[in-house]
Amino acid sequence: MGSPATRVVDDIDARPGSTTSLLRTVIGLYLRPLGGEISSAALVTLLGDLGIQPAPARTAITRVKQKGLLLATPGARYALNPAAVPMLERGDRRIFEVRTMTPGDDWLLISATVPEAQRDVRHQLRSRLLFLGAGTVAPGLWITPAHLAGEVEALLDETSARPFATLFRTSDPQPSVPLRDAAARWWDLDALRAEHDRFLASVDALDEAAPFAAYVRLLDSWRVLPYVDPGLPAELLPADWPGSRSIAAFTGLSARLADAAWVHVRGVAA
């Protein structure tokens, strides 16, 4: 196991809207363009702009430092752990480059049998695959769009599950029922719809007059969706699927808020 300076825990269970989740969103958005460092005072101020009091803000900072995302540096400053950069870059691609499947795109099947003696590996593999948006075909067998192959390979390495897994790529899965019906079994479409509904409701509550807070809360609310929703092709989804509305809301608000939010951050961090 790596030291805190090299090992970073991806806090995938951080609930959107929580202090820890908002802090991670601020770090992911702004520490790299700020040069990788920020003062403790500036970080607490930015969290204050999100309505978070100093005490819980400092508690959250301590938590993400313990997770390895931040490193304490001299002068009451925090630096982004270089080991976290690949994780954040993967997140950028998923969050800002939304991709949906089209007819004829390949699928990736992941078959894994993890020994009982390594139950922790099995649990991590299952939870990470589900967060990645994989559907469950059968116990030990998952399916994703093939364009996620790189993320799946990284996940298998990070969870130490690669020796137990075999990957298959196909353009023509043939379940015993129509593929649309099979997809409804493999993915919990009701839960995915609820995530879209939650996001769209959160968008309605944003105050664009405070662009920094609105943008961070937009990103924090959105960040789960591009993971848990695999972007299935339209012909496998209900006719009233809300995915396109969510994407349009996110991209439109991002375009309106991002620049003003960045100006605010630079002013606080200067």
Regions found by a protein language model. Name each.
Residues 60-67, 129:
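Basic amphipathic alpha-helical segments that dock to polyanions
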Residues 116-206:
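Mid-protein regulatory/catalytic core that forms ligand/cofactor-binding pockets
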Residues 180-270:
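C-terminal regulatory/effector modules of DNA-binding transcriptional regulators
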Residues 65-75:
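A short, conserved structural fragment
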Residues 34-46:
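Short acidic, hydrophobic short linear motifs in intrinsically disordered regions
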Residues 1-29:
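Short alpha-helical segments that sit at the start of domains
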Residues 76-81:
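Minor-groove-contacting beta-hairpin "wing" of winged helix-turn-helix DNA-binding domains
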Residues 85-108:
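Short, amphipathic alpha-helical interaction segments positioned at domain boundaries
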